[in-house]
C-alpha cells in the first residue's frame, strides 16, 4: 500500500545504486509498457451501463465488493454476466463457462454481433494474471474484448500497483529476477513478499506483517491514512 511519490522516490534511490525495483510482488504478468494492458480501457461507470459483463479469473465479491455491487446493480437492470474461473456466490446469476484455459479459449472466435450492438465489459482478475501463463491469458482476454467490442478492465487488488507501474517501478523478469542476486532488499510496505534467508532486509512500512518479521532493520513508515499522496485506482484514475 504505497503511494506514487514514495514508489518513484524508491525507484530513483535504488536504481542510482545499480539495483532493481519491482512492484509486481505477487508475480502478476502485467506488461509494463502497455497501459491499456495493465489498466485497460474501461471506466467503472461503464459497468453501470453494460448489458454484457464477462469476468475472468476473479471473485469481485471478495476482491472489490463495491465494484461487485455495481455489477449486481447492472444485473438487476438486465445485464448478462459470464464467468471463467472458480464458481462462487457473487450475489447475482451468471453463465459459468468453466475454470480452465479451454473455457476461455472457447469464448474466442464466436459470433458476437448481438454483443457488439450493446455496451459490454470484460474484467480480468489478478488470479488469472498470477498464473505462469498469465501473459497468454491476458492476450486472450484482450482478444475477447476486441471480438465482442467490449471495454477491457484489469481488476487490481493492490492499491499502489497501478501508480507504481506508471512510474516504471518494474524489473524485466519480475519479482524473481529482482530478488535472484540481491544482497540487500529494501522492502517498502510489501508485506506479502517471501524473501529468502540470504539477503539483508530493510523494511519500511506501517504494519507488522510478514515483511517486518523478516527484516534485519525496520524503519518507521506512516499508514496511508496518516500521509498525503497519490494513488491510481483500478481504472487508471489518480486519487488523493
Segments (PLM) and residue ranges:
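Cofactor-cradling patches in redox/metallo enzymes
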Residues: 1-8, 62-63
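Non-catalytic terminal/interface segments that mediate subunit docking, oligomerization
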Residues: 12-22
Amino acid at each position: 500500500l504505497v503511494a506514487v511519490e514514495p514508489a518513484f522516490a524508491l525507484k530513483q534511490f535504488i536504481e542510482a545504486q545499480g539495483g532493481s525495483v519491482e512492484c509486481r510482488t505477487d508475480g502478476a504478468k502485467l506488461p509494463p509498457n502497455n497501459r491499456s494492458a495493465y489498466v485497460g480501457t474501461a471506466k467503472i461507470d461503464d459497468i453501470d451501463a453494460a448489458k454484457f459483463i464477462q469476468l475472468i479469473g476473479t471473485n469481485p465479491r471478495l476482491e472489490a465488493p463495491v465494484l461487485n455491487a455495481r455489477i449486481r446493480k447492472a444485473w438487476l437492470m438486465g445485464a448478462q454476466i459470464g464467468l471463467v474461473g472458480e464458481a462462487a456466490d457473487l450475489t447475482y446469476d451468471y453463465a459459468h463457462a468453466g475454470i480452465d484455459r479451454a473455457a476461455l479459449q472457447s469464448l474466442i472466435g464466436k459470433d458476437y454481433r448481438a454483443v457488439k450492438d450493446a455496451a459490454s465489459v470484460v474484467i480480468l482478475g489478478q488470479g488469472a494474471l498470477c498464473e505462469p501463463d498469465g501473459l497468454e491469458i491476458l492476450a486472450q482476454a484482450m482478444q475477447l474484448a476486441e471480438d465482442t467490442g467490449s471495454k477491457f478492465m484489469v481488476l487490481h487488488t493492490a492499491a499502489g500497483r497501478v501508480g507504481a507501474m506508471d512510474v516504471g517501478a518494474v524489473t524485466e523478469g519480475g519479482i524473481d529476477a529482482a530478488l535472484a542476486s540481491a544482497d540487500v532488499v529494501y522492502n517498502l510496505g510489501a508485506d506479502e513478499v517471501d524473501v529468502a534467508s540470504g539477503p539483508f532486509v530493510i523494511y519500511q512500512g506501517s504494519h507488522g506483517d510478514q515483511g517486518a518479521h523478516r527484516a534485519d532493520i525496520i524503519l518507521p513508515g506512516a499508514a496511508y491514512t496518516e500521509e498525503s499522496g497519490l494513488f491510481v485506482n483500478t481504472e487508471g484514475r489518480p486519487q488523493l
